[in-house]
């Protein structure tokens, strides 16, 4: 993020936030420019200052469940799709959003299909969408979507 950057991290599990904090500490990294928030990703706009709406450089989603924790606690399309809409509105022109999808776990395939449908329906004038998937792996292997928000003068 550099000296001027700021990171907001969201999760509904305190354990995930604690693990993140521990990783920063182990790496000798300061948490001065990091805010870890115990809340759902679909409420991100409520936690990000209005002055930063439309100015965020990057948003990253790592969907699914927390490895080594309760695998019944998963992300679902019900909160993920509104979170993606919110994230797109927060991005600055030419900002990037990445989404790692895990169709291999129970419920992951449903969420992945919904996210792909959402991304496929984005107007080209608003964003470009890239799918990065390993073709020589099983169909339920994790994969990445990357979305670049259009420059304001590229629209229309």
For each predicted feature, which ranges?
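Conserved SAM-binding motif I beta-strand of class I
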Residues: 6-11
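A short helix-to-beta-strand connector/capping loop
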Residues: 5, 29-35, 125-127
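S-adenosyl-L-methionine
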Residues: 18-54
